[in-house]
Amino acid sequence: MKGNPMQPTIISCAVTGSAPTPEKNPAVPVTPAEIAESAIEAAKAGAAIVHCHVRDPVTTNPTMNIDLYRDVTERIRRSGVDVILNLTTGPGARFSPCDHDAGIASKDSQMCLPAERVQHVIELRPEICSLDVVTMNRRRHVFLNHPDHLKEMSAAIQTAGVKPELEVFDTGHILNAISLIEDGFIESPQFFQFCLGIDFGAPATVEAIVMMKNMLPKDAIWSAFGISRFQFPMVAAAVLLGGHVRVGLEDNIYLEKGVLAPSNAALVTKAARIINDLGGSVASVAQARDLLSLSR
């Protein structure tokens, strides 16, 4: 299932991440109440999946505080809005070496053991969690996911009954994911997310999507997103190539050139319009669960 242009398109909304800050766009949610409310608004606008990080309410910096994850999760669940919750496991994999010893992590590093990175997933049991099947250079650090750590995290996620969203930033990461699949750590149908336009990863181009989707296992389901100005062009490309899409303030803070997005819901609304204008349809939450083989 490498893409079917006739199927309904799942919209994921990445509500808040690590980089965008309220200083860049006041709409970026920070507190658990803001994150949950923004996720709920995005769901009402058409997002079947909401992908959530948490931030320190005082510093606005990304954090792995499980109490904040719990607060966000409970607020969304209490709202009565039906949406698929996707919690990140990305934090805890940032490494930069000390100037005096490359084998020692600098104070800017944030490295955690696998059990710490999935603790909130085990306790809160979202339907989906992200799994970054990737090691790559970034501007100031290495995004470092050791193969043994990925196996340990995958096993814990599988035992918890949570579906991993396999985030891949380049073609080699797909081969890494396939290795996990062949070793029995990832069940079918796999859900891949192509993360495009990020420094030193695959570019946000049609050619990159075609190459990456052609490498997937036959039953895999895929989605794609582009960061910043590439967000909406990649929505159109993914729809036309039979995939699903992701938008949100984690990846892009603009609604159009020079116009800040007033909310995550506004980005979802624009993505839904593109899908419909191209002759497609937006997947309901029930349809998304069916496509992803989720059992609620």
Language-model segments: which ranges?
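N-terminal small/glycine-rich loop or linker at the start of catalytic domains
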Residues: 2-27, 91-92, 97-100, 130-137
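Histidine-centered catalytic micro-motifs
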Residues: 13, 32, 36-37, 47-59, ...
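Glycine-rich, proline-tolerant flexible connector loops at the mouths of alpha/beta enzymes
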Residues: 23, 48-72, 138, 195-196, ...
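Active-site beta->alpha loop and helix N-cap motifs at the rims of alpha/beta catalytic domains
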Residues: 32, 69-144
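Conserved, mostly hydrophobic/aromatic
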Residues: 35, 42, 53, 129, ...
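Alpha-helix-loop-beta-strand connector modules within alpha/beta enzyme cores
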Residues: 60-89, 152-159, 211-219, 265-275
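Catalytic alpha/beta core domains of metabolic enzymes, predominantly
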Residues: 127-250, 261-266
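Mid-to-C-terminal alpha-helical segments outside catalytic/metal-binding sites
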Residues: 269, 273-296
